[in-house]
Amino acid sequence: LPWMLRYQVPIWPERSLTRHDGAELERLVRNRSSAAWQAGEDFAETIGRLRRAIQIPSAAHSALEYQRWAARSQLRGEGRRFMRSMKRPMSVPVLHLRGDGDPYVLADPVNRTRQYAPHGRYASIAGAGHYAHEEAPGQVNDQLTRFLEQVYARPVS
């Protein structure tokens, strides 16, 4: 959690993400993704695009807002209302995908959320880290297809 606290400081985190053409962004992605994806050509292309995108004015600020809101909102009324609403089980079907090598979203907390999504489908993406949709798009698409076929009770093409 120290990184979450560092993101609360104004301006510095944005500068950190954009400095040296987005080198910090690349470091974060590498720390949260699988070695197999990093070794591929797709990773080099993707990381190049991400490093360019983080340089767009306000992109770094927007990328950090989720972490800022998650920390700060706990002290405000909106955060308390959000947390109350999240304690109720959801009645809609949910697909929760997680890379089995994700060091950021851990398996145990994910498994504890099952009580809130009784109609949920939880799937682990083998060999993927935090960016499963980028690292293993075929597996993710297969899971999405199966989920949609289950929800709509018919084949999805």
Q: PLM ranges: what are they?
A:
Residues 1-124, 145, 150-152:
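Flexible "cap/lid" subdomain of the alpha/beta-hydrolase fold that forms the substrate-access gate
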Residues 154-157:
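C-terminal amphipathic helix plus adjacent low-complexity
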